[in-house]
Amino acid sequence: MNRFADLTAAGVLTAFGSDSPVTDLGPWQAVAAAVHHHQPAQRISPIAAFRAHSVAGWRAVGDHESGVLAPGAPAHYAIWDTAASLNGSAPLPTALRTVVSGATVHDLGVVGAR
């Protein structure tokens, strides 16, 4: 089940999502599950898993402009706490700031604070 490595190797665009309320809505848990797949041969890198849960969703719906940080691109992005790890016992990453269409919609007030 969830043959992430096989799909990735075959060049299949793999976009993660959630089947909530069947399972908990947890994007980072899904990324961690793909990185630490129960079948070692089906594990994918953290970068591939993160892309599957971010930019791949835009690509799956035919949007080839969103999901990148580039001049003129729509400003949809999040800044994450990089001290977090996808190790099963480590705390999950925390969103420090989220920007949608250029407007800040979430801010913990720690980005750029000294």
Question: Where are each of the predicted segments found?
Answer:
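Short, small/polar residue-rich loop motifs at catalytic or cofactor-binding pockets
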Residues: 62, 91-93
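Short, Lys/Arg- and Gly-enriched loop/turn segments at beta-strand edges
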Residues: 84-90
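His/Asp/Glu-enriched, well-ordered alpha-helical/loop segment
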Residues: 1-82, 98-104
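Conserved protein kinase catalytic core
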Residues: 25, 87, 107
